[in-house]
Amino acid sequence: MAINIEYVILRHLQMELKAPFTTSFGTFQTKELILVEAVDCDGVSGWGESVAFSAPWYSEETVKTNWHMLEEFLVPLLFSKPLRHPAELPERFAAIRQNNMAKAALEGAVWDLYAKRLGVPLCQALGGTKKEIEVGVSIGIQPTVADLLQVIERYVAQGYRRIKVKIKPGWDVDVIRDVRRAFPDVPLMADANSAYTFADAKRLQALDEFGLMMIEQPLAADDLVDHARLQPLLQTPICLDESIRSYDDARKALDLGSCRIINIKIGRVGGLWEAKRIHDLCAERGVSVWCGGMLEAGVGRAHNIAITTLENFALPGDTAASSHYWERDIITPEVEVQGGLIRVPNAPGIGYEVDRRQVERYTQFAKVFHRTATA
């Protein structure tokens, strides 16, 4: 089936978070993002979302660099020759090094359009089978431990299946001890966002007593070797996030023993197809995966739900309810969590309608790129 995309619209959105979100590398009050709309010859739209932040805290990509890459390189490559399947795009984009979040945003829009043309949910087009997915919640660094415990209590009461607490030097062992004392039976993990070095091994070993599901990305964002040295010293499984940008990164990490769990983020690895390949590799190796979050708006959240329906996404992901982050999301219905579960939509494509009124409300500027004139 040919995918005949006539034009692409890039929209720069700015959305206000309901509450500040703090990690080891910064505090976020607003989220900028690029919404990608790919429209075919029959007027059917597919939607994708860039998950890059406004500054290069998480990776070298930013909203501005993503816009540049999409405008100058990726959209022209999309239009450069006929396309029959979204899985062709990674090879087409391979000449562009890195810039995975920009690639994923455009590829995601094409996948959504492709599934809609087939008349099937995106999850089915990807090979997913689950009808509902388990979800956890990610909680940023709070002003005080008392504040953190109060936030956790609220989300435990809402039924979230796993609590993730951000940590950094000075906000780690004692904090996790207080959390575990208050919530002895809650599935709990810690996320360091690369805040430590191998010299901190003894401090990280001190987390073993709390029965954590995992510690996420304790060491440098580009490291595999020191994680492989650290993992045998810990009872707690290491989960890699920032270090895994591709199938080959995942293969090397598993070969080295750098981790026991992998967090798959669609944007970080360059799109849905690469995410699926990493999922399949981990399934073959007996390594569980889960879907991480990047403060996505509704379109990105919908893509996360779709990929999580693959069988080896065996651990609760970060795809919390829309209301966890936004007063009003850009999709309808919004993503809702009931008893720690999200019911997977069965409508074609991402399964949610994009609320164009809300999109217009949040849009700062936009640009249209036609097949016949990509500038």
Curated annotation (Swiss-Prot):
It catalyses: (1R,6R)-6-hydroxy-2-succinyl-cyclohexa-2,4-diene-1-carboxylate = 2-succinylbenzoate + H2O. The keyword Metal-binding applies. InterPro entries: Enolase-like_C_sf, Enolase-like_N, Enolase_C-like, Mandelate_racemase_C, Mandelate_racemase_N_dom, MenC, OSBS/NAAAR. Its EC number is 4.2.1.113, 5.1.1.-. Pfam families: MR_MLE_C, MR_MLE_N. Pathway: Quinol/quinone metabolism; 1,4-dihydroxy-2-naphthoate biosynthesis; 1,4-dihydroxy-2-naphthoate from chorismate: step 4/7; Quinol/quinone metabolism; menaquinone biosynthesis. Converts 2-succinyl-6-hydroxy-2,4-cyclohexadiene-1-carboxylate (SHCHC) to 2-succinylbenzoate (OSB). Also acts as a N-succinylamino acid racemase (NSAR) that catalyzes the racemization of various N-succinylamino acids, including N-succinyl-L-valine, N-succinyl-L-alanine, N-succinyl-L-methionine, N-succinyl-L-tyrosine, N-succinyl-L-serine, N-succinyl-L-isoleucine, N-succinyl-L-phenylalanine and N-succinyl-L-leucine. This is o-succinylbenzoate synthase. The lineage of its organism: Bacteria, Bacillati, Bacillota, Bacilli, Bacillales. The gene is menC.
